[in-house]
Structures are given as structure tokens and as C-alpha cells.
């Protein structure tokens, strides 16, 4: 893979997550019954950061959990046909909550769909919303994010790599050519 460009640096990611946190508060008319569910792996630290920002703005602690969607991969750049749910992956009560799924990149929509199925399987939420740092297009399912950090039309030959300091020791969104 060949490095192409930096889409977001550390400061841009912080600004983007701050905006998403404000949008979540505004759309939900506050933070009552909100639960942020990070989709493993990089969605979890992103969800924690958004929750910390909401707490800073509203002085209310927001519940954060995670959902583990295991992906079959041909290699590190392509997701196979069906994401699989780790049966013990949902670590939070979802009944009558406003669930906000948080992921790093929205691409085909298959991971988001699998995460929604996991939530519904564990209870009936009031509603499910989706927040993503990057929406790169190429949807295969009729899924759209409620909160988008950055829309980036990409070619299928490109790879969007989100790096978070909790996992990768730096914050950046980079584009590579396959």
C-alpha cells in the first residue's frame, strides 16, 4: 500500500468529535437515556471520547459500552461478505435507551447492520442512531449515519485508515492506495 494523504490530524479529529458531541446533544434534546456503543475496535475509544466531551458540556455522565463484530477478512483491507457477532459482545442494557452506535469508518454498511442486529437481539431500544468519524461511501445497504465527522468520496482502490492514540499511539485519518 502506498500512502496518499492525511485526511484528519489530531486537532482536526478533536474538532470533529466536539462537533459530533454537540450534534448528539442537540438532536436528542439533551442526554437523557443516551448510551454510546463503540463498535470494536476503534469505535470504542471514539465513543469514550465523545462521551467525555458530552460530560464536559452537559455535566452528565453518559453510559458507554461496546459491541464486538468480528469480521472475516481476506486481508487487512477488505471485509468479507458477512460481519459476525461475538455472542457475548454487548456489555450494556439497551432496553428503552437511545443507542448511538459509534464506528471509525462507514463503508459498505455491513458492520453497522450487524451491530444493529446485535443491539436488537439484546433488547428493544427506544431508537438506534449511528455516528462515524469518516463516511467513505460505497454503500451496499440502505444505511446512513446520523452523525458524520467527514464525508470522503473514495475509490474502491483506496483504504481509509483511522488511527487512535489508545490503540495506534497517534491520532490521524490517512488514505492509502491499494
From Swiss-Prot:
Keywords tagged on the record: Glycosyltransferase, RNA-binding, Transcription, Transcription regulation, Transcription termination, Transferase
Listed SUPFAM superfamilies: PRTase-like
Reaction catalyzed: UMP + diphosphate = 5-phospho-alpha-D-ribose 1-diphosphate + uracil
Listed transmembrane segments: none
Pfam families for the chain: Pribosyltran
Motif PRPP-binding per record, residues: 99-111
GO molecular function per UniProt: RNA binding; uracil phosphoribosyltransferase activity
Enzyme class: transferase
InterPro entries: PRibTrfase_dom, PRTase-like, PyrR, PyrR_bifunctional
Record-linked Gene3D superfamilies: 3.40.50.2020
Subunit details: Homodimer and homohexamer; in equilibrium.
NCBIfam families in the record: PRK05205.1-3 (NF003547), PRK05205.1-4 (NF003548), PRK05205.1-5 (NF003549)
Family according to the record: Belongs to the purine/pyrimidine phosphoribosyltransferase family. PyrR subfamily.
Name under which the protein is recorded: Bifunctional protein PyrR
Organism of origin: Clostridium novyi (strain NT)
Amino acid at each position: 500500500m502506498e500512502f496518499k494523504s492525511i485526511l484528519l490530524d489530531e486537532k482536526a479529529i478533536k474538532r470533529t468529535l466536539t462537533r459530533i458531541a454537540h450534534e448528539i446533544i442537540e438532536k436528542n434534546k439533551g442526554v437523557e437515556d443516551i448510551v454510546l456503543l463503540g463498535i470494536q475496535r476503534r469505535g470504542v475509544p471514539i465513543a469514550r471520547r465523545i462521551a467525555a466531551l458530552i460530560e464536559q458540556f452537559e455535566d452528565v455522565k453518559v453510559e458507554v459500552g461496546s459491541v464486538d463484530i468480528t469480521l472475516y477478512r481476506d486481508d487487512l483491507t477488505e471485509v468479507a461478505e458477512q460481519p459476525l457477532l461475538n455472542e457475548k459482545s454487548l456489555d450494556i442494557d439497551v432496553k428503552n435507551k437511545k443507542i448511538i452506535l459509534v464506528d471509525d469508518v462507514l463503508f459498505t454498511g455491513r458492520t453497522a447492520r450487524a451491530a444493529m442486529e446485535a443491539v436488537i437481539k439484546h433488547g428493544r431500544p427506544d431508537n438506534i442512531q449511528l455516528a462515524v468519524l469518516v463516511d467513505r461511501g460505497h454503500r451496499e445497504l440502505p444505511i446512513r449515519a446520523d452523525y458524520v465527522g467527514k464525508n470522503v468520496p473514495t475509490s474502491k482502490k483506496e483504504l481509509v485508515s483511522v488511527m487512535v492514540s489508545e490503540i495506534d499511539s497517534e491520532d490521524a485519518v490517512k488514505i492509502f492506495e491499494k
